[in-house]
From Swiss-Prot:
Its EC number is 2.7.7.6. Belongs to the RNA polymerase alpha chain family. It catalyses: RNA(n) + a ribonucleoside 5'-triphosphate = RNA(n+1) + diphosphate. Residues 1-231 are annotated as: Alpha N-terminal domain (alpha-NTD). It comes from the Bacteria. Homodimer. The RNAP catalytic core consists of 2 alpha, 1 beta, 1 beta' and 1 omega subunit. When a sigma factor is associated with the core the holoenzyme is formed, which can initiate transcription. This is DNA-directed RNA polymerase subunit alpha. Keywords: DNA-directed RNA polymerase, Nucleotidyltransferase, Transcription, Transferase. Residues 247-327 are annotated as: Alpha C-terminal domain (alpha-CTD). The gene is rpoA. It holds the Pfam family RNA_pol_A_CTD. Signal peptide: none annotated. InterPro entries: DNA-dir_RNA_pol_insert, DNA-dir_RNA_pol_RpoA/D/Rpb3, DNA-dir_RpoA, RBP11-like, RNAP_asu_C, RNApol_insert_sf.
């Protein structure tokens, strides 16, 4: 008789406590030991591997280091930096951007004053206090915003080519505020030694708890599949087969390197892809359909047009193009 491992049919959601920033998820039944294994794995990936947006540095006019004080501003620069670390963003933009804020006192500088120049991001905690500007004082502040994962110290945000007076900031990119899990016993038939794992996820509002666990699950799945598909045996090929494989490989690599601007697309689709920073066929097919629909102004009409283009090249969305990328 083959022993069948117990696994949850699906992940349950606690509707009573669910919100846009908090979710409680239940996985049961699990074999003994799997509650802690899965809980630890999900917690680590949620906290360290999900992308987010944060301030990476600032430049204040006539201020040249982070230990300065600013005439007519109640807070000193270190305190302003600490407050700026707490600003949370929602953004689909992959590239770094800069925005300039001019503060004319008397006023309270809150996070809501930080506005994008081209709609690259949205500030979530608009009421967050950053500084108090006294009457007769004007402060000009450049704010540098970037995308990343987890926590990045200020030194790693210090890049070449930054202007004189650039002050790097520790960046907390993770959109997850807190993750915790508990493991309880649960019954299956007459047996009570199975486990129930309860996972609680709190986000900063830039991503829903549902999307966060789904994204974390895909990250874990992509890594585990490397082991599931492992095969040490290598197939033997003739010299002619090797040459054919090389030719097909190079043909595909050249195809994936095709510029989007060379495709016969509508102006709307071109603009959508440009804003999403998708420049080549390879970058396009590496996206899934639902990911593209999340981009601003990207609708089903544009998606249908792109699918028709991909069909011409025998390509599809969601392809793994890792092996074709240049080392």
């Amino acid at each position: 008789m083959i022993y069948q491992m117990q696994m949850p049919a699906k992940i349950e959601l606690d509707e009573s406590s669910h919100s846009d920033s908090f979710g409680k998820f239940i996985a049961q039944p699990l074999e003994r030991g799997y509650g802690v294994t899965l809980g630890n794995l999900m917690r680590r990936v949620l906290l360290a591997s999900l992308p987010g947006t944060a301030i990476t540095g600032i430049k204040i006019e006539n201020v040249y280091h982070e230990f300065s004080t600013i005439q007519g501003v109640r807070e000193d620069v270190p305190e302003i930096v600490l407050n700026l670390k707490k600003v949370r963003f929602r953004s689909q933009c992959k590239r770094s951007c800069k925005t300039t804020v001019t503060l004319v006192g008397p006023m309270e500088f809150t996070a809501g004053v930080i506005q994008p120049q081209e709609g690259e991001f949205e500030v979530l905690n608009k009421d967050l206090h950053i500084a108090t500007i006294n009457a007769g004082t004007t402060v000009t502040l450049d704010i540098f915003i970037g995308r990343g994962r987890g926590y990045v110290p200020a030194e790693e945000n210090r890049a070449e080519g930054m202007p004189l007076g650039f002050i790097p900031i520790d960046s907390i990119f993770t959109p997850i505020r807190n993750v915790k899990f508990t493991v309880e016993n649960t019954r299956v038939g007459q047996r009570t030694d199975y486990e129930k794992m309860i996972l609680e996820v709190e986000t900063d509002g830039s991503i829903t708890p549902d999307d966060s666990i789904s994204l974390a699950g895909r990250v874990i799945s992509d890594h585990v599949l490397l082991f599931a598909d492992f095969s040490p045996a290598e197939e033997e090929y003739t010299e002619e087969e090797f040459k054919q494989q090389d030719d097909e490989f190079e043909t595909m690599r050249r195809l994936l390197a095709t510029k989007i601007e060379d495709l016969d697309l509508s102006v709307r689709s071109h603009n959508c892809l440009r804003l999403a920073e998708i420049d080549t066929l390879g970058e396009l097919v590496s996206h899934k359909e639902d990911e593209l629909l999340n981009y601003k102004n990207f609708g089903k009409k544009s998606l249908t047009e792109l699918k028709e283009q991909l069909d011409k090249f025998d390509l599809k969305f969601g392809m793994d193009i890792t092996r074709y990328q240049m080392k």
